Amino acid sequence: MCIRDRLSTGLAYLIGNPNFDLMTGKYYARFHVKHQDSSDSYLRKAYTNLDLHTDGTYVKEKTDWIIMTKMEEQNVGGGESVILHLDDWEHLEDLSNDPVGQEDFVWGSPKSKNVDYKVEHPVFSKDKNGKPIISYIDQFPEPKNMKQGLFLQKLSDALEQSKNKISFPLPVGSTIFSNNYFWLHGRKAFKEHSGLSRELLRIRGTFFY
């Protein structure tokens, strides 16, 4: 384990308990984004935007926070990090109060995630202070009807078109630590290069209570 692994893992255990990652069989995940990829994961599709989302939408465990560390990269253009806080989102009041967004949606996952079940939960709910929180990713919902499908499309459009998204290059060795209930994160598409390589470390977990 390198120094960046140790620092990220140390931070994780200072703030809570890391979740077991079924995709890797460990309490963290390290993965590469490269020029060519044959997996079923959007995370590894270099030349496609990774739209704004939260983590843990398709698992039974709570996901309070996420740590993302850039381990290394070569021949990279583009691929900037994108984040959005719910309080800065122009359409929060409208969509978080839509009754459809408070219905249970079915959430599944591709084979690479190694999760052999599906879960149900709403997109929007409230925290203990009555503030809206979100659990959403555009790749995994299985709408039960047209009403839910149209809501998901409206939600996706409203997030991606937000003028308050923050886009920035994350230097190698840097870490993003975010609350998973009101920070959404994503990534811009990379510029094509045959030697493209980026390695990331991800840890997800729950706060101490």
For the regions a protein language model found, what residue spans apply to each?
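Mid-sequence acidic-hydrophobic segments that form the walls
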Residues: L14-P18, M71-Q74
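Short, small-residue-biased leader/transition segments that mark boundaries at the very start
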Residues: M1-I3
